[in-house]
Amino acid sequence: MAFSFGQQGSSIKAPSIGSTGVFGQSNTTKPTAPFGSGSIFGSTNTNVGAGGPTGSSSAPPFGNSIFGKTQQQPTTSFSNTTTNAPQSTVFGQNAASRTGNSNTQPLFSWSTVNNPTKPVDETNATIPSSLLLSSGISPNATVSNAQYGPAQPPSVEEQVQKILNAWNLNHPDCAFQRFFYNKVPVEQAALYVKPPNYNQQKWDEAVANRPSNSVVPVLAVGFPDVQKRINMQIQQVNTYRIRMREIVETLGRLSNKHDLDFSIKLAEAKNRHVRLSERILRLAIKVHVLRHRGYALKPNEEELRKKLDDLTKSLNNPEIFGRLNEIWARITLIFEGEKISEDQRSNLAKGVVDWRKNSDQLEVITDVLRDHQVGLSYVVKLMQEDLATLNKQLTEHVPQSQK
């Protein structure tokens, strides 16, 4: 006795000999029930009798599906001929035709039935309920896409979700992911392992593509991480600049200390070396003279003595001292000329002299002009005297020639 939503089902008769179906189920024949006293929505579920010699069957007047649609089992006979009846799905529609066409449904999944009118969309097709019940498969199972055609393209919802995941910084499929590298000591690089929230494949690729063994990959997700890395690099560069400035200042202090301490000590050591060299040379001269006292000079020593005598005479020559004084005077004039500023030199080159600032030069020029004036006066006086003498002689000579 079966109940469906509170209604009493129809009674089932005992099976007779030879009344088994194709898959071994017992096909029972139920009496025709009146309208409204059957299945879930008021219809009576009846099975077509099988195994009889004539293959006769009885059908209910209103069908046996959940929504009142007719569901029939194939009728078999001893001649192994099978007549396919239209199969109905859970929602009362024929599995072979969803568009209104009455097509036959193959019994097994590898059997194919050609539809001359319109291809059936088998992507989401459900397996017939009778076949699932006989094979032990759940009626809610769907046919795989590999058996009934290629997979359908992703839906709009899946595409939108994929785009959302690509922009979500906390999702593993985020598109804004980039591995950077941090430099660490070589002995510590092997101690770094993959963090728990990193992708193993991407981590292995980053480790394989690192430029050297002294760097480790670091994942940056999105623009905030890139900005953090830029700020850290700027901070590190500023730290390096501060350190470089400290190094330059330290080098400056060491250089000043070297110039003040070691340079002075080096100059003192050089002077001491020169004094010691002179003392050693004088000592060597005295030792050599004492060793060869009373001995005749050798030819080379005699030549050296003559050269030394000549040098002594040249040093004591007064002409040399006069020449030295002249050279010293020229050097003094050169030094004095260097003391004149560049402006004064340019003014002198242009002929412009600031007499208020160059009183010494004015006195020098005055003295030179005075000397020139005296010289010119003397020349004029000589010329006048010579002219008077010439005129006198000419005067005396002309009368004598006339006489």
Swiss-Prot record:
Keywords: Cytoplasm, Nucleus, Transport. This is Nucleoporin nup44. Residues 1-124 are annotated as: Disordered. The gene is nup44. GO terms for biological process: NLS-bearing protein import into nucleus; nuclear pore organization; protein localization to nuclear inner membrane; ribosomal subunit export from nucleus. One of its GO terms (cellular component) is nuclear pore. It comes from Schizosaccharomyces pombe (strain 972 / ATCC 24843) (Fission yeast). Residues 1-31, 67-124 have a biased composition (Polar residues). Its main location: cytoplasm. InterPro entries: Nup54/Nup57/Nup44, Nup54_alpha-helical_dom. Gene3D superfamilies: Single helix bin. Functions as a component of the nuclear pore complex (NPC). NPC components, collectively referred to as nucleoporins (NUPs), can play the role of both NPC structural components and of docking or interaction partners for transiently associated nuclear transport factors. Active directional transport is assured by both, a Phe-Gly (FG) repeat affinity gradient for these transport factors across the NPC and a transport cofactor concentration gradient across the nuclear envelope. GO terms for molecular function: structural constituent of nuclear pore. It is found in: Cytoplasm; Nucleus.
